[in-house]
């Protein structure tokens, strides 16, 4: 049996040094940036290298699942109420993009929240990294709102003060979801790429493109 550390190493293959440096000069973002910081399905398709014909956009954080291991909740998906809901949340936007309405061969999710203060955004980021301490190396069932259940194994590198990366792999498949969370000034942005094989480079490009629209 592989150790948890070995399993995490396998999950993280391809992630590497995917976190970009924080610019030396930055200013807080305006709430309106969420309207264009989430990329449209055409741009997403260019990044993942596959046609993406379906998308669903939301202006409120949503969670449509529950997990057996609560410590893995905030790694199971992005754009979650537990992370983003805050009295100082000024604006929010997210989008799910996939191959088609019935095909999730490639599935991408983006989420971004602009907060009234840097402290509020930092609190949201810590609701990701603090509440998932101990999830790396774990396997848990994920129960979806449609009644189906998936089983995922999780791995993640140690987060920094501003960046977190993690991977989950579906049981008995080569399907993995590569995820990044980036804290930039008063913004928390998240990106997730799910596919067979290595989606690490794609999620890094996606998160970088989202960040570039903010000028942060």
Q: Where would I find each of the regions flagged by the language model?
A:
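Surface-exposed amphipathic alpha-helical segments
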Residues: 192-216
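Short, well-ordered beta-strand elements
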Residues: 108-111, 182-195
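Short, surface-exposed beta-strand/loop micro-motifs that present aromatic residues
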Residues: 93-100, 176-184
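Secretory targeting and sorting signals
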Residues: 1-26
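Short, surface-exposed coil-to-beta transition loops
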Residues: 106-109, 173-179
